Amino acid sequence: MKLFIFLALFGAAFAQRNGFCRLPAEPGICRAFIPRYYFDVEKGQCEEFIYGGCKGNENNFETLKECKDACTEPEKASDFEKADFETGCKPAPETGHCLASHERWFFNTASGECEAFTYGGCGGNDNNYESKEECEFACKY
C-alpha cells in the first residue's frame, strides 16, 4: 500500500512538473523577435519558435538544452546520428541570421577536430551541433 501511494504521488508530481510541455507554442501578444524553444508533443522533440517577448505560456525555453532537460529523456550517445560528411561536417560554420548567442560545435576539416562557435539561433547550415560529443559522433567516428 505504501508503494502504491509513493508511486501515485511521484507520478502526479512528475506529470504536474512536465504538464506545461504539452502546451502549444505561444508567441504572446508583443512584437519582439526572440528565438525560443518549445516541446512539440506531436513530434516528440523540442522545436524553435519566435517569441514576441511577453505573455505566452510555460512551454517557452531560452535554450534547446533547457527544453530538453524539462521535457525529454536524457540523450545517449547512441541517439546521435552520423552526418553526411559533405553537408554536415565539411562546410564552414555559419552563425545564422538571428542575434542570439548560443555555444555550438562544428567540425573543422583543417584540424580534424570539433570546435566551438557562436550560433545566432536560426538559419546557418548542418555543421552545427549542440555538443562536442554529438559533433564527434557525427563527423569523427
UniProtKB/Swiss-Prot annotation:
The UniProt record lists the keyword Manganese: no
Pfam families linked to this entry: Kunitz_BPTI
Entry coiled-coil feature ranges: none
First-listed, main subcellular location of the protein, grouped into a coarse class: secreted
Disulfide partners: 21-71, 30-54, 46-67, 89-139, 98-122, 114-135
InterPro entries recorded: Kunitz_BPTI, Kunitz_BPTI_sf, Prtase_inh_Kunz-CS, TFPI/VKTCI-like
Keyword Disulfide bond: yes
Signal peptide: 1-15
GO biological process: envenomation resulting in negative regulation of voltage-gated potassium channel activity in another organism
GO MF term set: serine-type endopeptidase inhibitor activity; toxin activity
Locations listed in the record: Secreted
Domain BPTI/Kunitz inhibitor intervals: 21-71, 89-139
Tissue distribution of the protein: Highly expressed in midgut. Expressed in salivary gland, hemolymph and ovary.
SMART domains hit by this protein: KU
Cellular compartments per GO CC: extracellular space
Phenotype when the gene is knocked out: RNAi-mediated knockdown results in reduced engorgement weight and engorgement rate of the female ticks. Decreased egg hatchability. No significant changes in feeding time and 24-hour attachment rate.
Keywords, alphabetical: Blood coagulation cascade inhibiting toxin, Disulfide bond, Hemostasis impairing toxin, Protease inhibitor, Repeat, Secreted, Serine protease inhibitor, Signal, Toxin
Chain's role: Anticoagulant protein that targets host intrinsic blood coagulation pathway. Inhibits host fibrinogen coagulation. Inhibits host thrombin (F2), cathepsin G (CTSG) but not trypsin. May play a role in keeping the blood meal in liquid form in the gut.
Stored PANTHER family: BPTI_KUNITZ INHIBITOR DOMAIN-CONTAINING PROTEIN (PTHR10083:SF381), KUNITZ-TYPE PROTEASE INHIBITOR-RELATED (PTHR10083)
Extra remark beyond the main annotation: Has no significant hemolytic activity.
Protein name, entry field: Doenitin-1
Naturally occurring in which organism (per UniProt): Haemaphysalis doenitzi
Higher taxonomy: Eukaryota, Metazoa, Ecdysozoa, Arthropoda, Chelicerata
